[in-house]
Amino acid sequence: MIWRGRSTYRPRPRRSVPPPELIGPMLEPGDEEPQQEEPPTESRDPAPGQEREEDQGAAETQVPDLEADLQELSQSKTGGECGNGPDDQGKILPKSEQFKMPEGGDRQPQV
């Protein structure tokens, strides 16, 4: 017997959510108004010689940070290593040949 009734599936209409730019800035419950930044007292256009010195100093300070980050990443664990964590120290894992599996598979392995 073939049932050719009407399908009960009806797609739900899509709700239109306005983008965050149209809603406005989000405020924390304790914030009443966003605080405005004070205008800078120094000119933002340094002389060409000063700009180069500042850029070189910034590059020199960033390089050791990058090297430290790379060393930390190379030494950090990815989670794929087994038996090297603090929880695994001092534990001896049993060998698989010590267990005898029953034929039926319903019971627990015998040690």
Swiss-Prot record:
Residues 97-111 have a biased composition (Basic and acidic residues). Residues 29-40 have a biased composition (Acidic residues). Residues 1-111 are annotated as: Disordered. It comes from the Eukaryota. Pfam families: GAGE (PF05831). Belongs to the GAGE family. This is X antigen family member 3. It comes from Homo sapiens.
